[in-house]
Structure formats: C-alpha cells, structure tokens
Amino acid sequence: MDYQHIKVERGGEIAIVTFNRPDKANALNHRHIEEIEHAALGFRDDETARVVVFTGAGKHFNSGADLTSDDPQHPLLMVRRQRRRIGQRCIQAILDMDQITIAAWKGAAMGGGACIATAMDFRIGARDCFMSYPEILIGVNLMWQSLPLCVHLVGPARAKQLVIGGKHVPGPTLLAWGALDEMVEADAVVEKAMEWARHYAAQPPVAAQMIKRSVNAISGALDRSVMHMDFDQHHLAADTSDAAEAVSAYLEKRPPTFTGN
C-alpha cells in the first residue's frame, strides 16, 4: 500500500509510525484508518523491530474522525456495517502487534485518536496533551471495541467522565489517572518516547513479547465478548434525530437541542 496519510520509518530495533495529516490535526478518514491498520499488520513479518513509536506530525497526536471528510456513504446498511468495522480491525491490529508500542502524544487524542492511544502499551504525553471522546456530543456511542481499553486504563468512574462527559481531560489529570506513563514538555515528547523505546528494545525480545501477550490476555479476557455489538449500537444511535442534530450543530457552530429521538 502506498501511504498518503502516514509515514513509516524502519531503522533497526525501533520503528516510528507518524500520522501525517497535520493540516487536519491528523484527523481520520477511511483511507487513513486503513493505512494505520496496514502498517500495524505489516510489523508481523518484521524480524528486526522490537519497539514501534506512534506519533503525530504537527501539533497533535490524532484528533479523531474527520467530520469534513467526503468519504462516500453506501446506501446498503450491510456495506456500511462492513466499512465501519475498519476501526475495530485497526485497533485489534495494534493490540496484536508483537512489538512494544509507545504513543508520543502531543496535543489532542480525540475519539478514534484516543482509541489508538489507549491501544498502546505505553503513553508519553506532552504537558499540552489532552484526551476526549466527543462521540457523545454527536449523539453516538464509543465503538472500535475501545470502551474496555478506557476502563482498564483509568477505571469505571473516570471512564464514564471521559466517555459520557465528552470533555477534554488535560495532561496533568491524565498522568494522575494513570492514562499517561510520563509527561514532559512538548518539544521533548518524542525524545522521551525514544528513550523508553531504547530501554524496551534492549530487553530479551522473546520474553518481552510473551509477557506482553499474557498481560493483554489477562486484562482483556472478556473484551471481545462484551463489545462485539458496539458498531451495531453505533448504527442505531447514528440513525437518531439527535445524532443528526448534533452533527448539524457542530458544523454550524451552535448549541445542539436534543429531544431523545
């Protein structure tokens, strides 16, 4: 695949994947998500890379769905369901990577961007970083099988603050909650992530990979069984009048009026 929206740099034991739509705050369209999934799957056959650092070009890690995207909407629900599985596949591809994954996180990690960040093994954040799940603000649920990742990371009550509240949670709070492993100045975040990468790249790779898989299996044993319907819930919510009102209000920069329909 020829990448349009990401860059993949392979240089020995540490690789870097950069979300590369800085003019859109690295927002996600369908092609962008496909590229991230493809890159993650591509590391299955990489016998050299032991750690992969994910970061964003420009000021932001990843700002989530590009609501201005002109991605075509297929008239058949069956096809729309298939297309929307790309987000789940992308997150699962990241979770299944043998390599240790580290997010070098500046600015926003919103929606799908927050899902990607929570799928990483470690998160190094800049002081200006923040997380939010704005799906609730456009009348839909969080999908991509990522709700369990948020709950595992910050606990049930704080997950509800994030996912139901829809507010921006700043870096210092994320650090206190355990969503960040370390916080540094923005101009040092990539180098700090690389410092972590060098440490984990120096560990015995077979043992590191087995331990990672075991920890993920233990912590996420029920995740797929309880979240297999999240994209169908999304379709149900997305077809409501409230969801249409939320998107219109966002694009028109006005407060929404929700009716429960």
Where are these regions (language model features)?
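Hydrophobic, secondary-structure "cap" segments at the distal end of domains
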Residues: 147-157
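Terminal low-complexity tails and localization/encapsulation signals of metabolic enzymes
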Residues: 1-3, 248-261
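Glycine- (often His-adjacent) and acidic-residue-rich active-site loop
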Residues: 56-93, 109, 139, 222
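C-terminal long alpha-helix characteristic of the crotonase
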Residues: 22, 124-129, 180-228, 241, ...
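Well-ordered beta-strand positions
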Residues: 122, 161, 165-167, 173, ...
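Conserved CoA-thioester-binding segment of acyl-CoA-metabolizing enzymes
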Residues: 1-57, 92
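Glycine-rich beta-to-alpha active-site loop
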Residues: 90-138, 142, 168
